Amino acid sequence: MTITAVSAIRKPVLAWPLAEPDWLIAAGAAMAMLVLVLFGPGFLDDGDTTWHLAAGQWMIQHVAVPHTDPFSFTFAGAPWQAHEWLSEVLMAAAFHLGGWTGVLVLFGLVLAGSAFLLTSRIGKSLTGISLLLAVVLALACAQPSLIARPHVLVLPLLIGWTAVLLNARASGRAPPFWAAGLMLLWANMHGSYVFGLLLLGVLGLEALIDAEPDQRLGVVRDWGAFAAATVLAAVVTPQGMAGLLFPFKLMSMTGLGNIAEWRASDFSKLGMFELSLLAVLFVCLSRGVKVPLLRLLLLLLLLHMSLQHARHVFVAAMVAALLLAPCVAQASGAVRVGARVNARPLTWLVAAVAALTLVGGRAAVATPRGDAPNTPQAALAHVPAWLRAKPVLNDYDFGGYLIFEGVRPFIDGRTDMYGDAFMARYAKIVSPDQAALDAAIRQYQIAWTILPPDSPVVAELDREPGWRRLYADKYAVVHVRQQDAPAIH
């Protein structure tokens, strides 16, 4: 059977009364993501979520994007690139409108839309069980990174941008100029936009290589014009040209190894990334899947990035699924040219009502926010207001929560601002290197500390005669200098 004949087969053997099965897979993926965010545990528990919210609140209050640090006491006034400013404003607006429930609804709708968009695009190539497995593997790989932070808000842009470029290659034309608007949003929301530029370069070069000799000048003209518009859009940010260099500066920092998400992927225990990788290898090897050379090199780069830094699995899973789907379909002899996942209006209505019901159910019940590993709520509540105003030595993961509560931290998740030297010094302080700890206490006039119970500094301060415990629970221990202790009752 020819590819044309196969692509003409649009309807399944068993007709569904309201929608194609593929549309139901897309809708099911969207609903699953919505439920996971709205009702699943831990989505709000990341230590950076709170400082992103605080940054957004600051920008709304001042109607400006900060260029210096307004939060910490160690780097107050130091240069800071708020490169995720638009995401932070959206997060703060959602929090203002609906509290923590508003934040969950924002991210839930974004992830639901992303899942539907991803499934719809893959559904142009795969169908049925193949489509379901591809989507499940991609979303399962991304699951550890699904937290309330800006990189999740740009997921629809990542998927949409990749889809636009692949559509352009399939149609033999340059991408439409309106797509540069996606880059404008992306560059103001998260630093991963540089990968979008890389993807454009790879597929643009592929278009040039694949073109007939007499058509290459036109390819250079059309793709070059779009690339110029895209780069121009990417520098329309508060940071301008410096914003293009920021992601590379961040990834070159040696201190990233101290942060869990920047460490190498862990294969000591079987996880979804390893399972997905093995599944993809099995399918590609068993079916003789052929991937165009430049796309193969791009996939290898994605794999390298994911092995080197666990946080890149999120991007790799989405892009790899979109790149490999047509290759797998062609190897299976089931190319669906121009296929779409669709549904009748009544089905859309039912899906919309279901989504609204889920959102309403979440809004009807207050979102619980109590103590968590990154939010020492009870511990901070026991610190008097006058003591909060004094310099504190805090755990790295507590910094965001302190900012959110109006306390100036010693350190927080803005690693790019603090730099390698300060990060290395902090690692010594909390190891603890006694000399480094004593020097920091003297230099910054540390009056209190808030650290996890298993921090070596906690045991050290317990032995120090000049310090005493103010409060302790399973999440945090607060120490106060003895000279301030008499004022606390």
Describe the residue ranges of each PLM region.
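Short hydrophobic/aromatic helix or loop-helix immediately within or flanking a transmembrane segment
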Residues: T74-T101, V105
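Short periplasmic/luminal acceptor-recognition loop of GT-C membrane glycosyltransferases, typified by
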Residues: P384-M423, R442, I446-D454, H479
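Short acidic/glycine- and proline-prone juxtamembrane loop motifs at membrane-interface regions
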Residues: S145-L153
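Transmembrane-helix motifs of polytopic, lipid-linked glycan transferases
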Residues: V105-K124
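Transmembrane catalytic cores of multi-pass membrane glycosyltransferases
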Residues: I60, V65, L117, G191-V289, ...
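Membrane-interface transmembrane helices that cradle and orient dolichyl/undecaprenyl
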Residues: I159-P176, L281-R287
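Membrane-interface alpha helices of multi-pass inner-membrane proteins
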Residues: L36, A138-A142, P176-G191, A229-A234, ...
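Short hydrophobic alpha-helices at membrane interfaces in multi-pass membrane enzymes
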Residues: N167-L184, V220-A225, L293-L300
